Amino acid sequence: MKNLAPGLLLAMPQLGDPNFYRSVVLMLEHSESGSMGLVINRGAPLTLGELARGQNLGIAAGRKEHSVYLGGPVEPQRGFVLHDDTEQREKHSVLPGLFLSVTLDALGPLLTNPNPRLRFCLGYAGWGPRQLESEIAAGSWLFTEATAEAVLGHEPSKLWDTTLRGMGVDPAMLVMGRGMN
């Protein structure tokens, strides 16, 4: 079994689940017992300013209008912060230059500091044992390597197209039901 974490999964047109239409998923865990990732390019109808206000947290002025992202349909009330703040104490390394924090104690300093790049996701995408491998074999997902720049540095609304083009795939050549034409 190829380890897909960390890596990026790109949803192909034939994946029928609307939760994942043109989604880019950062894989955080992939093992015999299942897989977990965060959709990093699907905005939620919520800003970081609204989130901070709801949690009674301070926030840097430049962050207030930043989008919150729908990380996936599982546990949508649970928050995950992807960031590049090397000074953050409560963090897990995802890949070089990219960290994951999951506590409110970690969120406060990340919101008030205007410097680290971050992406806040609500919920996550999860797969049972061998489920993701079956979906990949059916042509529902395309895998590529992940970088901190791909996760934090690209415009989320263009990430699916940008990543495909970076792989040498023309999105216009993708055909429903067959993956790449």
From Swiss-Prot:
- Provide an example Pfam family for this protein: DUF179
Sorted alphabetically, which InterPro entries does this protein's record hold?
AlgH-like
- Source taxon at top rank: Bacteria
Q: List the disulfide bonds.
A: none
| Entry's transmembrane regions | none
By its UniProt entry, which Gene3D superfamilies does this protein fall under? VC0467-like
- Looking at the UniProt record for this protein, which Gene Ontology cellular component terms does it annotate, in alphabetical order? cytosol
Please give the family membership noted in the entry: Belongs to the UPF0301 (AlgH) family.
> Which HAMAP family did the record assign?
UPF0301
Per its record, how is this protein called by name?
A: UPF0301 protein MXAN_2022
